[in-house]
A protein has these predicted regions:
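Signature for HUH/AEP ssDNA processing cores
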Residues: 1-91, 101-105, 114-116, 128, ...
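Contiguous ligand/interfacial binding patches
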Residues: 122-125
Length: 168
């Protein structure tokens, strides 16, 4: 991407603080942060997991059951209680809660997968207002703010129990 386009992307983020600082922090997960900025101009950037953060992949069915809702507002309300960033991927019917690195070493909840070192995740640019394709369901409030694994595990457990009860 040329410098003028990159500058335009940064200007759009500056209008939504602390989005630019969060974008810089996320981009620093990559060996070449400039390539992340280039990718964001086109769509989500592919970032390595395990350095700055891991991601817990949760099915949409599990999240919707935990929220006891399928409406945008009901699901967002539940996910915002994780107090950290959550990406929605409607193409794959999944959510990704960003959690501290090395969560993979202690994650014991079998109903959602924790992705870490060696895995990559499509991450949209912060403050992007779209619901087409991967997008932030809950924005990162400040650089380095992550969901607590215990809170995510509780959400997954509630969703799993509700799905199991509904199937019986």
């Amino acid at each position: 991407m040329n410098a003028q386009l990159r500058a335009a992307l940064r200007v759009s983020l500056v209008a939504k603080p602390p989005a630019e600082a969060c974008a810089d922090w996320l981009a620093s997960a990559h060996d070449r942060p400039i390539t992340v900025w280039d990718a964001w101009y086109e769509g989500p950037a592919i970032l390595p997991l395990g350095r700055l953060f891991d991601a817990i992949r949760i099915t949409a069915d599990t999240v919707h059951a935990a929220a006891d809702a399928t409406t945008h507002g009901g699901v967002t309300d539940l996910l915002s209680r994780l107090h950290g960033p959550v990406i929605s991927d409607p193409w794959r019917n999944r959510y990704y809660a960003l959690v501290p690195p090395q969560t993979t070493e202690t994650w014991r909840t079998g109903y959602a997968q924790c992705l870490g070192r060696g895995a990559w995740l499509g991450v949209p640019v912060p403050a992007l207002d779209t619901q087409h394709g991967p997008h932030w369901r809950v924005q990162m409030p400040w650089p380095g703010a992550l969901c607590q694994p215990r809170d995510v595990a509780d959400l997954v457990q509630v969703g799993h129990l509700r799905l199991t009860a509904a199937a019986q």
